[in-house]
């Protein structure tokens, strides 16, 4: 990279785009703590103030992935992730977490990458820990759970220690930055397929383009009706679909799949205790019809991404049958056992 940091900042402030090597160098400088906090804050603000670019996101994600080497060989299994950007402010229950266990119970091997909530709501890590999942299990044990339980949970801080130095600045800024978008792109197990929810429609194409550049085989990026960062039951959802290396726009209408329209507040979560209650009930085949329907709808996207079904409708039916059996909760119990400390 021949440009100086002020030159790159000026480029961004004029609405320009970083090239692959420039974006990678910026991320490497952040990780090495080479920039002053005021410079980092300026870059984060400049990136945020115009549309994110797929090339930038993919380049930064590659650097972060390289900084988080696996402690053991990756299992030779086709893996799917269900991590989204968060930030929709809808206070819905942990839909993507329920989807992960439902998809696993349908036979998809799921490597879910997640964290605690950064917004004061309840994140996937918060609710899973509350239900008894060990978040601090040795990394080899986390990877091994894929073959034991067909699903694992990668607690982001344990896999990306290099980001710890940036945490105080991100907290001080108090706004969402490019790092919120990179979270779903830096699963250390590098899944083959992914369903990724975004909280604003303008993120559909950048995130889908980044997944394409990162070499995923199949993926669905979804912007939910009403502003959810997952498929919603309140109306038609907007999708970007990656298949055979090509991107296309699509829509997902729950009514066309036989699901009743529901207001967004039918999916509300609440505090940690209520989120735990809802998640356990849904995984056991209970919960409200709206809760089960939205999990089935989003699970259908995962099943398609994994190549297990050929249509959204087929995926919804398979997910509903699985939920009714209570098998998703059995997957949770299997994962909890797989992550229990040896001798614990």
UniProtKB/Swiss-Prot annotation:
Cofactor, how bound (note): Binds 2 magnesium ions per monomer.
UniProt: Mg(2+) 2 binding residues: 229-230
Cofactor: Mg(2+)
Binding site for 5-phospho-alpha-D-ribose 1-diphosphate: 84, 87-88, 92, 94-97, 112-120, 124
UniProt-listed InterPro entries: Anthranilate_Pribosyl_Tfrase (IPR005940), Glycosyl_Trfase_fam3 (IPR000312), Glycosyl_Trfase_fam3_N_dom (IPR017459), Glycosyl_Trfase_fam3_N_dom_sf (IPR036320), Nuc_phospho_transferase (IPR035902)
Residues annotated as binding Mg(2+) 1: 96, 230
Record bears the keyword rRNA processing: no
GO cellular component: cytosol
Enzyme Commission numbers on file: 2.4.2.18
Positions bound to anthranilate 1: 84, 115
Subunit structure and binding partners: Homodimer.
Protein name per UniProt: Anthranilate phosphoribosyltransferase
Species annotation: Synechococcus sp. (strain RCC307)
Protein's gene: trpD
């Amino acid at each position: 990279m021949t440009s100086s940091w002020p030159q790159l900042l000026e480029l961004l402030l004029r609405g320009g785009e970083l090239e692959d090597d420039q974006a990678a160098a910026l991320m490497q400088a952040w990780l090495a703590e080479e920039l002053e906090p005021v410079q980092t804050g300026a870059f984060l603000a400049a990136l945020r103030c115009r549309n994110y670019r797929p090339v930038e996101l993919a380049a930064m994600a590659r650097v972060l992935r390289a900084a988080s080497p696996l402690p053991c060989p990756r299992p030779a299994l086709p893996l799917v992730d269900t991590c989204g950007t968060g930030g929709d402010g809808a206070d819905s229950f942990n839909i993507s977490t329920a989807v992960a266990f439902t998809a696993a119970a349908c036979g998809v091997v799921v490597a879910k990458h997640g964290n605690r909530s950064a917004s004061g709501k309840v994140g996937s890590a918060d609710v899973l820990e509350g239900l008894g999942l060990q978040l601090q299990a040795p990394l080899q044990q986390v990877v091994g759970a894929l073959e034991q339980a067909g699903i694992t949970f990668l607690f982001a801080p344990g896999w990306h220690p290099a980001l710890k130095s940036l945490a105080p600045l991100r907290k001080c800024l108090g706004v969402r930055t490019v790092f919120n978008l990179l979270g779903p792109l830096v699963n250390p197990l590098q899944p083959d397929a992914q369903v990724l929810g975004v909280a604003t429609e303008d993120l559909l194409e950048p995130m889908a383009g980044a997944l394409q550049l990162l070499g995923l085989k199949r993926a669905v990026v979804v912007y939910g009706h009403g502003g959810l960062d997952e498929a919603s039951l309140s109306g038609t959802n907007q999708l970007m679909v990656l298949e055979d290396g090509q991107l296309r726009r699509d829509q997902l209408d729950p009514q066309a799949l036989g699901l009743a329209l529901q207001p967004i507040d039918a999916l509300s979560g609440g505090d940690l205790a209520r989120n735990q209650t809802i998640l356990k009930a849904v995984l056991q085949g209970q919960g409200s019809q709206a809760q089960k329907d939205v999990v089935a709808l989003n699970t259908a996207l995962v099943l398609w991404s994994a190549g297990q079904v050929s249509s959204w409708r087929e995926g919804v039916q398979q997910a509903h049958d699985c939920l009714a059996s209570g098998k998703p909760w059995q997957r949770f119990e299997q994962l909890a056992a797989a992550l229990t400390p040896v001798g614990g």
